[in-house]
């Protein structure tokens, strides 16, 4: 059994969803190969490359850091089999995001930053918990982080939802503003906040004070909270998490219609403390070994199950004609 050096929002999500898959990916002696990137994954990665390269050039100047050149980001994030498709469709998402006004709103926030905003940094942090000697090591890759001139501590992320869906994807509740990112007649919600949003200017940023982020989406909350802790926010403290959610509906053409819902929220202290305890429990279990992984079993049964999982990919051969089929069909999926 391997022992992980850190936990991440992704691994914590897998632990919750499917303990068997967590063991295979992060702990098994014979690690499974990565599942190939789908188009649903690739569209978010492609848009990410377009928007970050644009923002970095606008703020720091062209060529300031080769890491943030479009080609570098795109090829690092989009797998080869998706690149032709993702190049076109990522441009569509970025152009829609820019033209509707969402990008300008983001630039206004970034222009109010105290010092330079931080982009796309992979960082680790040690979080203290009373049950864990030496603390818990967390890893994250925040899209953007800044502290504005009013002292607001902000972590920013993008989500592209429903791009490959045949049906319309609705935005999450509570957004502070939504843009129709298409040239047809706009809906009556264009430029307005959600009906359940109670908007207030707090430390220079309009946030929804009627909903915490955990009321909007648990996965988003966990991800941005962990990022905030790693970046220096205290567990239980007040910080702002910002998500621009791009949702899609079919147009009858190659490119879907898009809308951008802007979510700006806090994360409650009770939720942070609960998440903190949950992560400490996961960390304790994976460090304790096989007997603590499957908590619905006795320690002996848990060890036996882990021993079996260690062997699942022992004889896997990358070049076998059925290898890709075996990898996909023997794994847990969340995007089908």
Feature locations, PLM:
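Nuclease catalytic cores
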Residues: 5-60, 120-121
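Short catalytic/ligand-binding loop motif for oxyanion handling, primarily in non-cytosolic enzymes
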Residues: 23-24, 32-33, 162-167, 249-253
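Hydrophobic (often cysteine-bearing) scaffold residues that line and stabilize catalytic clefts
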Residues: 39, 43, 86, 220-223
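Non-catalytic protein-protein interaction segments used by genome-maintenance enzymes to assemble
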Residues: 121-222
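Metal-dependent nuclease catalytic regions and adjoining charged, substrate-binding loops involved
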Residues: 7, 180-221, 225-336
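A non-catalytic, helix-rich entry segment at domain boundaries
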Residues: 46-128
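Short amphipathic alpha-helical segments and their helix-coil junctions
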Residues: 1-2, 19-33, 155, 201-211
